Regions:
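Membrane-interfacial helix-loop segments of redox and metal-homeostasis proteins
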Residues: 1-152
Length: 152
């Protein structure tokens, strides 16, 4: 039970890390409440503005960070429900959903990393924060089903 709660808290923590990065992008590039250059580092490679304003920054006309906000919000909600829910069958289902979402999210993150490195030729630090959060969620989910399978 203790291991399960620790994994749930870690899932919530990384969910908020990713959500925070996506909201920062929203505030910077859509709502213009934060300077767009605030996450650009004087470098030929690290430049959020070039990544977020590139031709690859949307899917079906929607900026990728909106999908990130939705993704991390769902992960957080499922994890909070798991944390307070006492029904094992439902908790197992929520854990499976989080694992499935994490696998999907990791696949999308791999695609976006490819886009940043090989198509745009720039890296966005905030996007990278989101990618790290997604891969951390995947590792936590895998641990939940392997090492701590008795505490799902």
């Amino acid at each position: 039970m203790k291991n399960r709660k620790i994994l749930d808290y870690l899932t919530i923590l990384f969910g908020f890390l990713g959500l925070g990065a996506m909201i920062y992008l929203l505030l910077s590039f859509t709502l213009n409440l934060i300077s767009k250059n605030s996450c650009d580092i004087i470098s030929s490679v690290i430049n959020c503005t070039k990544v977020v304003t590139s031709n690859y920054s949307t899917l079906f006309g929607i900026d990728w960070y909106y999908y990130g906000i939705g993704f991390f919000s769902v992960i957080i909600v499922l994890s909070v429900i798991r944390l307070f829910n006492k029904k094992e069958k439902q908790n197992r289902l929520f854990a499976q959903l989080i694992l499935a979402l994490s696998i999907f999210g990791a696949g999308v993150a791999c695609y976006l990393i490819y886009v940043e490195l090989f198509l745009v030729h720039h890296i966005c630090i905030l996007c990278t924060t989101g990618h790290i959060a997604i891969f951390s969620l995947l590792i936590i989910s895998i641990l939940r089903f392997t090492k701590f399978k008795d505490t799902i």
